A protein has these predicted regions:
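Catalytic-core regions of core metabolic enzymes
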Residues: 1-210
Length: 210
């Protein structure tokens, strides 16, 4: 989708076994990249994700989306251990991270769509922002709005929320002048104060939270 919608920023796939992916040159590791990455999309097996986050931060990245599953959504000891290690790595590196176990994000104004959805997306900076833990439901909400001619400026799937949580996104959307309506899907609220503060920020900005 990054190629399909002609994202204008640099695209630097890291894959030691391939030279090209979708016509885009691959690099063997972070050290080989021609410039510092701004955002890293993590698609490696769970056992490698923690090191990728640390390597991304060392390479100068500021944020990451971890699509990889196999963490706290599973109950086995190894998955729980990896989840704890990932959370610690995010804390230590200071990266702004969505996921793991999520389905990517949309920033329409930037033609940035890191989701596997192959349905047509109108890349216009709409006035609605969506965030939530269930990627499938968030994607369904976006599609329902799209079908009704309602523009979606941002869509963020947060998954297990090892880093950023949905209320963090709500606060960001509340401060963004391009957004008029905030839609969220919550499976739970870990920090009720942060959630209340995000709701208050949206109310102060005159933006309904649905």
């Amino acid at each position: 989708n990054l190629v399909k919608y002609k994202y204008a920023g640099g695209l630097y796939p890291i894959n030691a076994k391939r030279e090209m992916i979708w016509g885009v040159t691959c690099y063997k590791d972070f050290a080989s990249l021609p410039e510092k990455p701004d955002h890293v999309l993590v698609l490696v097996p769970a056992r490698f994700a923690v090191q990728v986050i640390r390597d991304a931060a060392a390479a100068g990245a500021r944020s990451a989306t971890i699509v990889t599953s196999g963490f706290s959504e599973l109950q086995d000891e190894e998955s729980q251990r990896l989840a704890a290690e990932l959370k610690q790595a995010i804390k230590e590196t200071g990266l702004a991270v969505t996921g793991p176990n999520c389905l990517g994000n949309l920033s329409a104004g930037e033609n940035l769509f890191t989701n596997i959805d192959d349905r047509i997306v109108t890349m216009e900076q709409g006035a609605v922002a969506i965030a939530g833990q269930s990627g499938a439901i968030v994607m369904a909400i976006r599609q329902a709005l799209e079908d009704r001619g309602v523009g979606v400026g941002y869509m963020v799937t947060t998954g297990n929320e090892s880093g950023l949580e949905t209320p963090d996104l709500m606060s960001y959307f509340a401060a963004d002048p391009s957004i008029r309506v905030i839609v969220v899907y919550l499976e739970g609220v870990r920090n009720t104060k942060v959630f209340r503060d995000a709701c208050k920020a949206a109310r102060a900005a005159g933006k309904p939270v649905i």
